[in-house]
Curated annotation (Swiss-Prot):
Keywords: Antibiotic resistance, Cell membrane, Cell shape, Cell wall biogenesis/degradation, Hydrolase, Membrane, Peptidoglycan synthesis, Transmembrane, Transmembrane helix. GO terms for cellular component: plasma membrane. This is Undecaprenyl-diphosphatase. One of its GO terms (molecular function) is undecaprenyl-diphosphatase activity. NCBIfam families: PRK00281.2-1, undec_PP_bacA. It comes from Arthrobacter sp. (strain FB24). It comes from the Bacteria. GO terms for biological process: cell wall organization; peptidoglycan biosynthetic process; regulation of cell shape; response to antibiotic. The gene is uppP. It is an enzyme of class 3 (hydrolase).
Length: 286
């Protein structure tokens, strides 16, 4: 009995810690899913938190986006809805942004459904995570160095919106980073660091909420969530992710308005190499 109580307490602690990790890393170009996978390997349960846990806790961080940008989002939704009744012209900047978010969300929705089984199994290997951290870290470094960084979101085109969307879809592979992929795409297309980050946050809302609610539906319609953490522990992690994520959004936007992404590039490369060593010496299992 005491052993069972101890196990329950450990699960709550681990879930809270993973919620903190999710909130700290979701909006930074360093891959929150990779960090959940890595940190989970070092915890007493030494288990992958699972795709369902990851997707549901992301509901917390995306709720933080909605709260942080609520004025922008209300304005965009109103203008977009107005185009459906022709009260607002389709070239209205806010209405266009609404359509661009929808358009940019299509690739990750389609590819996520097609490759769902692989995403929840083989692609969660830490060998793949380590490789993606390094490879996409180097791509981010190139984009940050060569991007013109002169375009604002008012100049976002539908073609660029699709390109953003496919970059976001790459984040279905843990280690790529959803924000990292979309920010990299924005820099390569000449957008400023802050503009690339802002659109990245808005673009994530439909896809992440769709994925999280789908996983939540699967959990509620079956016996429960798979993995070491039950629904109550996952709810705690989601709440913590929301609070921490809200703070990180403001800090990150301020940071990238005056500095480069070099810090995150070096961090990704260091973490990827460290992960290779840990896996190679069997300190953790893939």
């Amino acid at each position: 009995m005491l052993h069972d109580v101890g196990s329950i307490n450990v699960n709550w602690f681990e879930a809270a810690l993973l919620g903190l990790v999710q909130g700290l890393t979701e909006f930074l170009p360093i891959s929150s899913s990779a960090h959940l996978r890595i940190v989970g390997s070092f915890l007493p349960n030494a288990a992958d938190p699972g795709a369902a846990f990851t997707a549901i806790t992301q509901l917390g961080t995306e709720t933080a986006v909605i709260v942080y940008f609520w004025r922008d989002i209300v304005r965009i939704v109103k203008a977009w809805a107005g185009t459906l009744t022709r009260r607002v012209p389709t070239d209205d900047p806010d209405a266009r942004m609404g359509w661009l978010v929808i358009l940019g969300s299509l690739p990750i929705i389609v590819l996520g459904l097609i490759f769902q089984d692989q995403i929840e199994s083989v692609l969660r290997s830490l060998w793949i995570v380590a490789t993606m951290l390094i490879v996409f870290g180097l791509i981010l470094a190139v984009a940050d160095a060569v991007g013109r960084q002169e375009r604002e979101l008012t100049r976002l085109t539908y073609k660029h919106g699709i390109f953003y969307g496919f970059a976001q879809a790459m984040a279905l592979i843990p280690g790529v980073s959803r924000s990292g992929g979309t920010i990299t795409a924005g820099l390569l297309m000449g957008y400023t660091r802050e503009a690339a980050a802002r659109y990245s946050f808005l673009l994530a809302i439909p896809a992440v909420f769709g994925s999280g609610l789908y996983q939540l539906y699967k959990v509620m319609s079956k016996d429960g969530i798979t993995g070491p953490y039950g629904l109550p522990e996952t709810a705690l992690a989601t709440l913590i992710a929301f609070v921490v994520g809200y703070v990180i959004i403001g800090w990150f936007l301020k940071f990238v308005s005056t500095r480069s992404y070099r810090l995150f590039v070096w961090y990704r490369i260091f973490l990827g190499l460290a992960l290779y060593l840990l896996l190679g010496f069997n300190v953790i299992s893939a």
